[in-house]
Amino acid sequence: MIRNRLWLVLLAVPLLVANIVAAQGLPTGTLAGRVSESEGLALPGVTVTVKSPALQGTRTAVTNVNGDYVVPNLPPGEYVVTFVMSGFQSATRNVKISASQQVPLNAKLSISAVAAEAMVVAQSETVSQSAQAATTYSTEITNKLPMARTILSSVVLSAGVNTNGPGGNTTISGAQSFDNVFTVNGVNIQDNIRGTPTGTLVIEDAIQETTTMTSGVSAEFGRFTGGVINAVTKQGGNSFSGSARVTLNNDNWQAQNARADLQAPYVDKVVPTYEATIGGPIIKDRIWFFAAGRYNKNDYSGVLSEPITGSFPRSDTDKRYEGKLTLTPFQNHTVTGSYTKGQVDQSNYYFTSYPILETNGTTYDRSLPTDLLSINYNGVLSSNFFVEAQYSAKNFTFENSGSRFNELIKGTAVLVQDRGYGQMFGAIFCAVCPGAGEKRDNENFLVKGTYFLSTKSLGSHNVVVGYDRFSSTRVSNNWQSGSSWLLFPTSVKTDGTNLYPVIDDNSYLLYAPIPQQSKGSDMLTNSVFVNDTWRLNDKLSFNIGVRWDKNDAKDAAGQTTANDSAFSPRLAANWDVFGDGKLRVTASYATYVGQIQEGIAGSGATGAGAPASYYYYWGGDPINTSATGPWMSTA
């Protein structure tokens, strides 16, 4: 899917809008600017020193002949930037760097009238000077707002974002809800089918900030037509720190709909969620660690539908863990590794799209484990050449979902037609059949090089060239029951204790074998991109880039279902009217290429992993149709 966009935006006092230029998947920021003397002449040879609790050691740069400097690969955090040159008063600026941002920071130095240097301290806001519309919200901000503590709650605070998609899913700039990109630490966490973020990979107290990009997005980002969301988790530091939190939730604390017929059945029960984080140094300025955990257990009741009403106990236990190591073995070279694991264990689960008439054989315990691994490297090879690379992998599995019996009797599911296909006797789906246990995984490799070019008359250029390889795989054999048989009686009778299916000429059997098992689909996209963030002067800047995406998709039978490619040019211009960041006019044009949809390209014409359907309608004598019995049970 290709989507073009043309935007003209007038922004006043854009205190939260940030310009994103780092490559997709690499959660660092960049500081860049120009240093001049009080009359505006460029100052070469100024030493720029960057310090932060988020940075291992310090970083330095020296302005070139045009007064330009750049400090790349900075982890998100609050920074103190010092500008020093012999014969001039030094200046210090405080600035906030967020993930995937290039923050502009210019400075003017005055000639020192005395031997001692004067220190000028000022505060610099994170103000965009590009045409890319992006908003960053830190946890510090969102904790003060009356909102849910989720990534998506931060996302919907951005302009152009709403939750009007199917099932309340997030849409950005009018695109389909499944065609956004959601990442944590630059790693894709989306479900392969629906495109929604995998919530069990997020520990809310571990999140440092969330950035949402909605328009004018750089060519370094791809596989979307809506927007790009990246959450960055905390990391360790040179001092130990941690947190502990208990969050209490109760349905009754929510307001009900004013219309009685639309009110939900709330349960007056307090459900706690426990979270904890800790981080600190293993070796100061060399090796840091960070760890986080989250635990929630919700005990509740399942409801039996007529003819025998009642309830039965159910529970969902949600456990999440994260660990991160940050290592700087050499100055200007940093390696970060992180691993996140989440698992939801569900007791007495059943296929909730249909009502349940009894628990005998229809409910089961299942697990939904998922994990996320990422390794990131960034390095400064010279004063104007930088490299970054990242590998990541996400795994998600449905474990023990369905019947535990593949024999004819206990493995056959019974769904009663006049009870809304109410379930009885046997469970839908199969946990013990060949190839059971659906897997939805992805793998990503990304590398880029950045060259900083400074010119006297044409400003400065951050030229990025990169390669991005993303593979999404799914293995699914959709067994409909343990025996592949399903019985659809017309109705059901009860003596108050047992259920008896009513079988007449409206009843039928469904045989649903899988003729060809899934080999696993593979949605592969190879991409290359080049992007120039061009700062002409203090008022004019541009973003010029192009991306090429090559799709190669194979369905569950291993047959090719997609083999195409597309270019997506990006062009943006920004005019800072007064040169102070308070009033900007931006215009952008972009072509975005959406990701391959697993639900379409992954199934293919062969239907591997999908069940066939053979219907057999009842033509024998009626069973259990008498008003008083005796009746025959399914046991």
Predicted regions and their residues:
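Periplasm-facing N-terminal accessory domains of Gram-negative outer-membrane beta-barrel systems
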Residues: 2-3, 10-131, 138, 144, ...
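Outer-membrane beta-barrel channels and translocator barrels
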Residues: 148, 234-236, 283-285, 330-332, ...
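Periplasmic N-terminal accessory/gating domains of Gram-negative outer-membrane beta-barrel systems
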Residues: 88-89, 93-108, 116-235, 250-280, ...
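Transmembrane beta-barrel strands of outer-membrane/channel proteins
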Residues: 122, 244-250, 291-295, 337-341, ...
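Residue-level signature of outer-membrane beta-barrel architecture
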Residues: 214, 233, 280-282, 327-329, ...
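Transmembrane beta-barrel wall of Gram-negative outer-membrane proteins
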Residues: 241, 267-345, 365-388, 569
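Solvent-exposed loop/turn elements at secondary-structure boundaries
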Residues: 556, 561-565, 572-635
